[in-house]
């Protein structure tokens, strides 16, 4: 993903969080449950937009390998930040609309 964004920067990033699922990768997983946070996140930088969406899901966008949601993989947010594509530091991201504290919706399995 980082290589693709580096090769062709994204002009508008949208994360659709109107309806989703948690607890697994699909409906075939017995513990999967529906989530209906009713949120849309949009921005002109895909790294910052994804960092905000990650935080809205109850995860720390500054987390790295070994911490949720990156328990078994490298953080694509860190890789993108290291490549100079944007920041994952919420203190450096301007958020408009509903404050993060009010919009958070826990997605933990």
Language-model features, listed with the residues they occupy:
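Acidic/aromatic/glycine-rich contiguous surface patches that form carbohydrate-binding/processing clefts
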Residues: 1-109
